[in-house]
Amino acid sequence: MKKLFLIFAVLLMTDLIAAKENQTVKLNSGYEMPTLGLGTWTLTGETCENAVYAALKSGYRLIDTAKYYGNESEVGNAIRRATKDGICKREEIFVTTKLVPWSNNPDRDIDDSLKQLGLSYIDLCLLHQHGSASGDDAVYKAMIRAVKDGKIRSIGISNFYTEKTVSHFIKNFEIPPTVIQNENHLKYQNNSLRDWAAKKRIYIESYYPFGGRGHTKEHLQNETVLEIARAHGKSAAQIIVRWHLQSGYIAIPGSSNPAHIAENFDVWDFELTENEMKKLNALDTGQRYENW
């Protein structure tokens, strides 16, 4: 298993270092997904729209939203602004949204997300979290129908942390998850799920890459992180983002500050050493901050 993951990580790193404009991985659906994006949880109104626009202007091509966030229309507005201003084309942007498991009509919710985003297709749609068994299955089946109808390109799940819970979607549905989006950071690395998922050609996507609100300071002021940051002339945030990427994760740090957004993306001109990665890996305590 360890050897397989090392091969998986090397292939990912080859993509990352190759070119700033080509930081993508190939999903088991056949589509390319950027490895670094902007998370928009808690961002609303003009703040959200301006943050997404700033991200696209800084080079990001992965934008993460969700129906539950209530900001899909603002994300869509930013995408239209960016494409109109010639910053990027729609087909260059990878948009992720999520559906809640308690939906009474997930097919309608998918259509509503498309309407709110102002898009003809969604690149990746995730089951946002575990609900009831019947609710989870209903949403997942709706996403599969949407794939067949051309409304969604890839599907996945979020907040599923064990092989057993993830295996349900692999064994019981014709289209497996491409991505598992979970809480993932230096203090909670869940390497066993990452290594197992790699064997299934499923990527782990890290939300809360800096620990999440209320814990960011603890991560950014960690002395091991700061020591490595000084060695590279980089910020603590950049070291942590780089750790996620070199560990084989997709990362979606969130921010509304254009300077921080740009800083988090400026990670393509250096690489952490094997020893530095070991030091950062050793910070794992198995501690999650959320119970979703």
What are these regions (language model features)?
Residues 4-13:
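Sec-dependent N-terminal signal peptides
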Residues 117-134:
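Active-site groove signature of glycoside hydrolases
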Residues 43-56, 103-118, 136-138, 163-167, ...:
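Short, acidic/polar
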Residues 60, 119-122, 152, 177:
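A structural motif
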Residues 41-46, 66-74, 100-106, 131-135, ...:
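Acidic-and-aromatic substrate-binding clefts and catalytic sites of carbohydrate-active enzymes
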Residues 130-292:
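Beta/alpha (TIM)-barrel catalytic core signal, keyed to glycine-rich beta->alpha loops juxtaposed to Asp/Glu
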Residues 27-28, 76-90, 111-120, 145-147, ...:
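Acidic (Asp/Glu)-rich catalytic clusters
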Residues 19-93, 142, 210-213:
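N-terminal binding-site loop/beta-alpha segment at the start of enzyme catalytic domains
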